[in-house]
Amino acid sequence: MEDSMEEGRTKEKKDLLRALKNFFDRLYDGRNMKKIFITSIIIASVIAVITILCGVYLNDYYRADGDEIGLFMEDKTHITSYRIDDGVTLFKGENMRDVGLIFYPGGKVEAEAYLPLMTLLAERGINAVLCEMPFNLAVLDVNAADGIAERLPEVKKWYIGGHSLGGSMAASYLDSHPELEGIILLGSYSTADIGDERALSIYGSKDGVMNRDKYEQYRPNLPKDLTEIVIEGGNHAYFGMYGEQDGDGKADITAIEQMTITADAIEDFIDQ
């Protein structure tokens, strides 16, 4: 009986080995090797195309208008700016308060486009901190504000804000950092529930980029006492200085005029 059982187990092992051999023979015969090769080429080609498309998308962004910014900054020698961390720049004026604003740029907009706005805030005594984003997308570094308050202990009250996508990501950050004083949204809305926080929302009457339906849909996420300002004649792009933006309305005022109105409104909001 034992001999018979042993013979059965031996036969099962041989059958299993034979089956495995047949499987690999079929897998690696000429035809299947050709199929595997073709499949590998197709997969590699798809990956290459996706990589190229991603590269094109991420490198297609709105660049700061260096000439216009240079002209604006000519008489701003009283404003200093310096790096406090990799990709984080602080703007300071002559008579600074103990309040600061951490700012997230709009989606696919070069951070330098907001130098004029940061300068205008610094002139009003607000410590303005501009955060550069990976591939100019704040969604890739929502926590860019981490550690900034610790590096500037002289600033006692911190607000966070941003333009467009940057504003939405700033709101997400505020949602998990209630120690901040409030938020400033420029042409933006909050998908996070920050109804218990102070909030200022500013957008232009000619804004053709911000989705008004989404703005109203997510309006309940903001406090009931929201301070809302509509800049008459302003558009979406003129919170920065990067030229015209696709789909945007034509502004009736200049970018500097819009940014000056914005800086004044932020100062008033902080002073309340």
Regions found by a protein language model. Give the residues of each.
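A conserved short beta-strand
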Residues: 179-188, 198
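Short beta-strand element of the alpha/beta-hydrolase
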Residues: 98-106
